[in-house]
């Protein structure tokens, strides 16, 4: 868990978000990012009442990409949790501690992505280290890189040997 050292006294998140990092193997391993305004992001979103983090992640994945739970394999050995500060929408001035949970998924077969909530999407070649977005994407990809070095199953899904 990564915490912002500027405000260590706040330890209880008030905003929760959950999503997926999706990989595919085309000619080489690639991961999916969604275009969100002037930045790249993951298919993710806030939890609905009564949802688990995993249920929210799968719902958001389907809503934002058209990918369903049956079209991916979820790595049971990887969950990325990250806390950081956000300014809530709606004109609020007080920052809130957000907890982001990301699951790692692999496409079982190539499928078209149906962008419904983003300007577009892009498959990025897996060639660490990546420098895409310092607050959430880069720490996630660093964690995935460490996981891939340890997990034979995840490496085999990407045909990394």
Question: Where do the language-model regions lie?
Answer:
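Residue-level signal for short segments within beta-strands and strand-turn junctions
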Residues: 22-24, 35, 106-107
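NUDIX/MutT-family hydrolases
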Residues: 102, 106, 111-146
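Active-site segment of metal-dependent pyrophosphate-handling enzymes
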Residues: 67-111
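Short aromatic/basic micro-patch
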Residues: 41, 97, 123
